[in-house]
């Protein structure tokens, strides 16, 4: 029997013979997901985010445990299947502005052979503002809050920039990753905002996926409080490190992000000068 468990505080792979306590095959402050047993039954393949929480690769480990090896080097693996002869992986992967594509990777490692490119010539001709993955220190004892920052390549000396903060939905969802975002439309809007002189920050606030059990469950019976603390810390970070103008800060989001927009406006009136709660729940 093999399964995933958060017993350690992080999602990891365990095996059990049904007689004794389950034994961990993987460990560490990262998450294992989508495990598959190889056709010969000798090793497990799974997704892992060992390098940083938003970097997903296919990893491999012996069925008895040991060293974990990263098979791919694509940064944004979405899912995969193993060939019947255990020699190749069919991988679906993506990037910040790269919609999911299909590639083949030798299971021993090596460069991916791309099978698809669904982007149009017009799309590929555009120059997009790439997100910067940032670590915002929590002033509320939560540790590191991962974020995606969009801004000009070079900040103008002495200039203060109006701020837009985006709140992802679902709660238990990871938005700060190297993958193509669920919120690709909002990402394109953020690209436009930067062209219009704004700076933008998205955060994987407490409740988000990919950061361990405690981060995911920290809002239990207090929804709307830890998440807002994280966004207030993000606002401080923009002011202190990206020349953000605290007097011109707005916030928006949809679904749970809409709920959090309301929480920000109602619980901290005056901090955000504008808010847009889209389809709030």
Language-model regions, residue ranges each:
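Multi-bladed beta-propeller domains
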Residues: 5-8, 16-39, 48-51, 60-78, ...
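Hydrophobic beta-strand positions that form the internal "hydrophobic ladder"
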Residues: 1-3, 44-45, 89-90
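Short catalytic-loop micro-motif centered on adjacent basic/acidic residues
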Residues: 3-4, 202
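Short, solvent-exposed loop/turn segments at conserved positions within beta-propeller repeat blades
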Residues: 6-11, 50-56, 95-98, 185
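Serine-hydrolase catalytic core recognition
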Residues: 77-281
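A short loop-to-beta-strand structural motif that recurs across blades of beta-propeller domains
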Residues: 12-14, 57-59, 101-103
């Amino acid at each position: 029997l093999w399964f995933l468990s958060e017993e350690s505080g992080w999602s990891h792979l365990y095996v059990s013979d049904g007689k004794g306590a389950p034994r961990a095959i993987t460990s560490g402050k990262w998450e294992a997901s989508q495990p598959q047993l190889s056709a010969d039954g000798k090793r497990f393949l799974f997704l892992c985010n060992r390098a940083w929480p938003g970097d997903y690769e296919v990893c491999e480990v012996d069925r008895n445990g040991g060293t974990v090896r990263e098979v791919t080097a694509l940064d944004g693996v979405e899912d995969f299947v193993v060939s019947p002869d255990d020699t190749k992986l069919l991988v679906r992967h993506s990037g910040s502005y790269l919609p999911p594509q299909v590639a083949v990777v030798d299971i021993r490692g090596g460069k991916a052979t791309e099978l698809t490119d669904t982007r149009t010539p017009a799309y590929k001709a555009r120059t997009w503002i790439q997100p910067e993955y940032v670590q915002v220190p929590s002033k509320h004892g939560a540790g590191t809050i991962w974020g995606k920052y969009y801004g000009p390549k070079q900040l103008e000396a002495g200039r203060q920039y109006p701020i837009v903060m985006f709140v992802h939905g679902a709660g238990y969802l990871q938005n700060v990753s190297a993958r193509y975002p669920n919120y690709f439309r909002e990402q394109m809007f953020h690209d436009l905002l930067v062209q219009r002189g704004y700076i933008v920050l998205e955060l994987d606030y407490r409740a988000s996926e990919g950061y361990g059990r405690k981060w995911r469950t920290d809002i239990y019976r207090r929804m709307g409080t830890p998440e807002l603390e994280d966004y207030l810390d993000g606002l401080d970070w923009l002011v202190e490190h990206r020349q953000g103008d605290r007097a011109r800060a707005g916030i928006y989001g949809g679904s749970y992000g809409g709920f959090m927009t309301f929480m920000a406006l109602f619980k901290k009136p005056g901090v955000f000068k504008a808010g847009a709660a889209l389809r709030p729940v």
